[in-house]
Curated annotation (Swiss-Prot):
The keyword Transcription regulation does not apply. Plays critical roles in virus replication, from virus entry and uncoating to assembly and budding of the virus particle. M1 binding to ribonucleocapsids (RNPs) in nucleus seems to inhibit viral transcription. Interaction of viral NEP with M1-RNP is thought to promote nuclear export of the complex, which is targeted to the virion assembly site at the apical plasma membrane in polarized epithelial cells. Interactions with NA and HA may bring M1, a non-raft-associated protein, into lipid rafts. Forms a continuous shell on the inner side of the lipid bilayer in virion, where it binds the RNP. Determines the virion's shape: spherical or filamentous. Clinical isolates of influenza are characterized by the presence of significant proportion of filamentous virions, whereas after multiple passage on eggs or cell culture, virions have only spherical morphology. Filamentous virions are thought to be important to infect neighboring cells, and spherical virions more suited to spread through aerosol between hosts organisms. GO terms for cellular component: host cell nucleus; membrane; virion membrane. It comes from Influenza A virus (strain A/Beijing/353/1989 H3N2). This is Matrix protein 1. The keyword Membrane applies. Its main location: virion. It is found in: Virion membrane; Host nucleus. One of its GO terms (biological process) is viral budding from plasma membrane.
Amino acid sequence: MSLLTEVETYVLSIVPSGPLKAEIAQRLEDVFAGKNTDLEALMEWLKTRPILSPLTKGILGFVFTLTVPSERGLQRRRFVQNALNGNGDPNNMDRAVKLYRKLKREITFHGAKEIALSYSAGALASCMGLIYNRMGAVTTEVAFGLVCATCEQIADSQHRSHRQMVATTNPLIRHENRMVLASTTAKAMEQMAGSSEQAAEAMEIASQARQMVQAMRAIGTHPSSSTGLKDDLLENLQTYQKRMGVQMQRFK
C-alpha cells in the first residue's frame, strides 16, 4: 500500500458515511494526484462543510496544507488552529511538545506512527497544531504518520461506541437503527438508479421503503416490525443491478 493510499484510508475512516464522505474522498484523491492546487479554495470549501466535527475538519485541513503546494506567506486558517489546540488543555500541550521532540528525530512514516500511537488523541491533535502553526517542522512523511495515528485513536473510540450500539439489547434502539439503515439504503438506491428505463422500478422500491419508514415512525410500530427491512431493500437493489449487468455482491 502506498503512503498516500494509507493516509487516505485512515483519514476517511473518521468521516461519517454519506454523500459528503464520497465528496471528501474525491477531493483527497485529486489533492494526492496533484490535480487540485488551489489551497485557499479547498480550505474555504472544507470550512463550510456541514456534519463534520471541528477536529475532523482540522485534520483534513492539516492534510490539505501538507499536500497542496502554496505560497510561503499563505495565512493559516483559524478553524484548523482552533481544532488542533488540544481543547486548550495545558497537559495536552506539554505532551505534544514531548512528542514533537521525538518526532523530530524520526524520518519514516511508520516510525512516527508507532511513536505517536502511545499518546492520547488530544496530545496528537496539539502536536499537529504545533506543526500547522509553523512552531515546529518535521518531514511530510513523519507528519502523515502523526495524522494516521490520530485517526486510528479516533476510529478506535468510534468503533467501540458503534459496537455498543449494535450490541445493545434495547429493542427500541435496535428498531430505530434498522429504520435509519433502511432509509439510508433507500436514499442510496435513488442516487444509484440514474435515469435509465429500469431505474424507474428501483426508484419506486426506494420511494416506497422511505414512505414505509415514515409511516412506521408516525404511528409507532412494534420494535420487531423493522426486522429484515434493510436486507429486503438490498435484495431488490441487487436484482436491479443484475438486470443492468452490474455484479456487486458485497453490500450487506
